[in-house]
Regions:
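Flexible, small-/acidic-enriched active-site or ligand-binding loops
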Residues: 162-164, 219-250
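Short Gly/Pro-enriched turn/cap motifs at secondary-structure boundaries
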Residues: 140, 155-158, 186-189, 203-205, ...
Length: 412
């Protein structure tokens, strides 16, 4: 059939640990590099991540020892980093696909991976100077270190430019720099992070023009991890508060222009939204990989429930939602690689993929009936995990406002 290849193996571990049948993959004609990334990451996800997925969720466990450096050995942490700096020198399309395949096995690991490789590593790649890249990229790309990014605060979520974390110019022991005071909240990877990109107010009177990006190291005096945050979903992706109490940061760790941090932040947010959309693609694929075998095997009224048209309609809607989200996400990722993306499409892909994923996950719970509402099957985890990206990286309400404003402005 036009558009299909021989199916690659998509292994789903049932509660009994048996392998389910594969589902066919549509060929989006993404190119050799993208397909090589998909195949290698899918194999790694099936063999190494999937067996740990339940433990990651149930125990809120971050598998740094088991998986993080292995992911570095595969080159996953430096997909968009140049080969000269130790990365693969590939693009956002390949990055989306890697996030998708990791998330198919464990969305929480996919979230931590995306926060590390895109929010931290890719921002240093884009905005760091030569000395900063030389110091920080190698251990982050190898997986020796974990990266994080911090912009949100308790009182600065959607209105992130109202942040209160202050950075005041100062000198210490003859070194010029800044003293940071305040907190950040809801910070992914914070408890394990070695290197953090942190946004702070360097000019409190300048509004959005008074924000600067800093590179923070975990052992900086005056910097500490506050309370760990327990989440409904994405358990195993560690989240915590950051506390800065007279934390001195030398001037050479300012990343990007002084007082120009909002440009660093907003441009990074566009790429973040595209790359993290891969999480939702992975969740939707995992839903189909779980539901289709179940509908074939579960019998009621003497026949497989997959023979009932209402169940067939559910699967059809799930499949179309996934493939539509994939087409949009891959197209915008390719536009990012061509430096042709728009802010409203970056918001559009995560808006559509997040709402689609939560709907698909909820329908997966429904398709499994009583079994879906137990911890014996992973669909309840898919639903809990899918909800995050209706909120994270900017809420869907903010995304709709941004899309409408940008389109009306463009039309005018």
């Amino acid at each position: 059939v036009l558009g299909y290849r021989p199916a690659r193996s998509r292994i789903f571990a049932s509660p009994q640990g048996e392998s389910m049948r594969a589902t066919p993959d549509f060929d989006f004609q993404l190119g050799e590099s993208a397909e090589m990334i998909r195949d290698s990451v899918a194999r790694f996800a099936d063999e190494q991540i999937a067996p740990l997925a339940e433990k990651i969720d149930r125990e809120d466990y971050f598998p740094r020892a088991e998986l993080w450096e292995q992911m570095g050995e595969l080159g996953l942490h430096g997909i968009t980093v140049s080969e000269e700096d130790g990365g693969l020198g590939l693009g956002y399309l390949e990055h989306v696909i890697a996030v998708e395949e990791v998330s198919r096995a464990s969305a929480s690991l996919g979230l931590s991976y995306g926060a590390h490789s895109n929010l931290c590593v890719n921002q240093i790649r884009r905005w760091g100077n030569a000395a900063q890249k030389a110091k920080y990229l190698a251990p982050l790309v190898s997986g020796e270190h974990v990266g994080s990014l911090a912009m949100s605060e308790v009182s600065a979520g959607s209105d992130v430019v109202s942040m209160k974390l202050k950075a005041e110019a100062a000198s210490r022991d003859g070194v010029d720099g800044y003293i940071l005071n305040g907190t950040k909240f809801w910070i992914t990877n914070a408890p394990y992070a070695d290197t953090l990109v942190v946004y702070a107010k360097t000019d409190g009177s300048a509004g959005s023009r008074g924000i600067t990006a800093f590179l923070i190291e975990k052992d900086d005096a005056g910097f500490s991890i506050g309370q760990k945050i327990e989440k409904v979903g994405m358990r195993g992706s560690p989240t915590a508060e950051l506390v800065f109490d007279d934390c001195f940061v030398p001037e050479d760790r300012v990343m990007g222009p002084l007082n120009g941090g909002v440009g660093v932040l907003m441009s990074g947010l566009d790429y973040e939204r595209v790359v993290l959309s891969g999480i939702q693609l992975g969740i939707m694929q995992a839903c189909l990989d779980t539901v289709i075998p179940y509908l074939r095997e579960r019998k009621q009224f003497g026949k497989p429930i997959g023979s009932f048209q209402l169940m067939q309609a559910k699967v059809a809607d799930m499949y179309v939602a996934l493939q539509t989200a994939r087409a949009y996400t891959y197209a915008v990722a390719k536009a990012c690689d061509a430096d042709q993306t728009t802010r409203f499409d970056a918001a559009g892909v995560i808006l559509y993929s997040s709402e689609s994923a939560f709907r698909v996950a909820a329908e997966s719970v429904q398709a499994l009936g009583g079994a879906g509402y137990t911890l014996d099957w992973p669909v309840e985890r898919y639903m809990r995990d899918a909800k995050l990206l209706d909120i994270g990286a900017g809420t869907n309400e903010i995304r709709r406002m941004l899309i409408g404003r940008e389109l009306i402005g463009a039309a005018g």
